[in-house]
């Protein structure tokens, strides 16, 4: 049905919230449609960032049936049972590492049983990426690439294959292999802001700054047309502008985030501003007003953005000979490391 298919396409492009809404709409049309529950449950898993809302996903499955056995009996076909078994593995007992491994094995079995199912094979590729959590394991990433390449050969417009190829090749060594997928992906999924942004990961690695600027302008426009901030694309756009010597354009972008924070100081907006100011400081080496003001981090759990900002302020202070200020930032970094070790994840892959 259309709602389910829309949710599936959005899921392949990591538009998790929008995908969830579509899967719920599919359930409303047909409360017994097992795959709509599968999709909603899977939307709570963000493998490239090592994040997962286990409680919410299990609640979705509970709406389908009170036990695994009860849920499996509602699957109408062998293929549906395979899909459902995959999320049962992902959200079952055990540690996240154990559940991710079982999810990978379940999708491997499904893809082997139904090799014509390009979505199953694409999700299998994604599950290889998810085995690495927030780190990059080259062997697993190349396994993901091999599976996604096989899907690409059959359907070069498959959004999952294109997206996961970009992620699999997202490093300076493998980036040339990802250029083909990067060129296609944004055109295949024009309504997904993430799909517009992701090709710039490859463009960044290859120093293709004009292409990176174009991709992130498109991503930002798509996000804003849907009522989203599009801040991740904005940060990358500002960085790409600086690489092209477009300092004034980059400054306007960073200032626009500060203006948004002044109007609406949400945790997300403030985190973005910390990232943006850190980037400005490192790239320009200038401790001007653009980068100098601290950002309120009240109520923000993630340490990464503010650690990056402390680091940038410390580097600029050290370069200018202000040893005391540099040491103060170093102490702040150490304190963050001591109190929130392991929280800084999910940046490179996003």
Regions found by a protein language model. Give the residues of each.
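Solenoid-like repeat scaffolds
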Residues: 26-29, 111-113, 152-154, 183-191, ...
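Long hydrophobic segments that form regular secondary structure
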Residues: 9, 124, 238, 245-339
